[in-house]
Amino acid sequence: MREFLCETQELAIGYGKTPLASGIALRANPGQILVLVGPNGAGKSTLLKTLAGQLAPLGGTVLLDGQDLTAYTGTARAQKLALMLPHTRRTELTTCFEFAAAGRIPYTGRLGILSDADRQAVQDALEIAGAAHLADRDFNCISDGQRQRVLLARAICQQPKVLLLDEP
């Protein structure tokens, strides 16, 4: 039996006990790009949150590297999968570099102390996302488009196998 990087089996998604969609079958191979297209309210964001483990499935299974997503610890899941949502809470007195560096938390331990390699991973991710010039700027004082680039950098520097991007 072939294992996919990410797979769903008879997945049902939604909030509470009301499914937005059910019977979802998705399979993704390494390097593959999948795009979800649909109208507002169709459940695209809900599906991404369920794939990331932020929402529990209402039915079915999410597999990551052939293993049920619920079997992963939060840290192990974060090392394999990153979710970028379009809106995030504003933080006080946080530079864009520091905000992006939160993507390294799965690797830094509880104290969150960045090694030189972690700092380089953050810098590289900011460059890939076109946000290196924002590194020293306050995250609250940049445009929405710039904020999206920093959010993307945070997801990239997490170095996951799976990137889930909601309205990148």
Regions found by a protein language model. Give the residues of each.
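Conserved structural motif at the start of ABC-family nucleotide-binding domains
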Residues: 6, 21-23
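The feature captures the beta-strand-to-loop junction immediately N-terminal to the Walker
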Residues: 37-39
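Helix-to-loop junction immediately C-terminal to a conserved catalytic motif
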Residues: 52
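Conserved ABC transporter NBD signature motif
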Residues: 60-68
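Conserved ABC ATPase "signature" region
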Residues: 101, 116-134, 159
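Conserved ABC ATPase signature
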Residues: 113, 138-142, 146
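Catalytic Walker B motif of ABC-type/P-loop ATPase nucleotide-binding domains
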Residues: 163-167
